[in-house]
Amino acid sequence: MSQYKPYPIYKDSGVEWIGQVPEHWKIARIKWISILNPKKSSLIEGKDSLCTFLPMEKLRTNTITLDETRTVKDVYDGYSYFCDEDILIAKVTPCFENRNIAIANGLVNGIGFGSTEINVIRTNERSYNRFLYYWLQEDRFRTIAISEMRGTGGLRRVPTEIFESFVIVLPNLAEQNTIVAILDKETARIDALIGKKKRFMELLKEKRQALITYAVTKGLNPDVKMKDSGVEWIGQVPEHWGVVPSTWLFVERKERAHADDQHLSATQKYGVIPLAEYERLEERRVPHAVKNLEQRKHVELNDFVLSMMSFEGGIEKGKACGCVSAAYVVLRAKVGAEVDYFAYLFKSDLYIQCLKTTARFIRYGQNLNYGDFRQAKLPKPSLEEQQHISKFLNLEVARIDALVAKVEESIALLKERRVAFITAAVTGQIDLRGG
């Protein structure tokens, strides 16, 4: 961005947070240059025609997924209406903070309906839609809009009046076009770099999972003689390993919560940690249990917790003492089971697939239960070998995680650079007229 110079002459915008703007730029409220949530009365006679349908989860930054179709009459009431070239922007948390905004294009019959949590902005002759699209990604606009959100928890929304009355600055249409052309080029370049880094990060994560799965089911000695485990999900194991029922290694802890137990959160991302710590790490509040507290289950450090309703992420290791919902099964390791080894095994792709297979024939609406866990046999190296494998994985996983963290940091920096360039361009801090 250093190659771009400022405009030759600036003036005071009269808006404190905007400050100085190019002398020939104008100040306008968003509602002066656009229509917010346009009326759909013109569609009354075409209600039998098809249109695109857009759930909230299919709106992302600069992307909408157009794979759902409805008849207009089925979605006419109760959904947001939009057309090709309209700006679609999420108004609810966390979608707004995640910059879920795009311009509609390629809609069936040029028409779409979607979630009411999407605001639709249709520019008029005073503004080019892509210029306003970039303006709505400007950092200070987003900061102010987030600070004005109303509601509680996960239902906080940007008020409509923020979109209508917010003051922006803009040049004439020809200059807007020039700015947008350069923004399109530069953001596409940055997005391509981000895409490459994300693919590299996914490869690292795949390598991490493959390493874990191989180590916990095949060991670390590539020359060891193998045998058939007799268990489909495990396959071959070293000849000296055992394969035993889960109950030989783990027992269900049925202890009720203690009076002084802290509430724990069983998460795929962090394991089983205090609820307060989870809220701190995620920087958000989550619902706290207030009913049936006497039915909660006690958890000790290094116990395992299995969600009967959501087991796709495997079984989580307890990293603190406390209590969890009665909807969980709590497992205590017996003598001869190295907790860290089984922590890796229980999060491996093969074991998770085994749980899914075990639960495949469970009638819809029922949960996985302890009996289903018991069905899965487990590999059993010696305790010494379990410890050796877990120490090896601790080192290798930490190394891969450090690489992933570096890639994530570089992606965050690229995203910051993208936002900074957009902000500088749409507020007139840099002059893009010379290309």
Cite the ranges covered by each PLM segment:
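Non-catalytic DNA-recognition/assembly elements of restriction-modification systems
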Residues: 9-43, 165, 173, 177, ...
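A short glycine-rich beta-alpha junction/loop motif
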Residues: 10-13, 111-119, 150-177, 308-309, ...
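Ligand-binding loop in jelly-roll beta-barrel domains
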Residues: 122-128, 333-338
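Short, ligand-facing micro-motifs at secondary-structure edges
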Residues: 52-68, 87-114, 130-134, 143-148, ...
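Sequence-specific dsDNA recognition surfaces
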Residues: 11-14, 31-43, 52-87, 247-259, ...
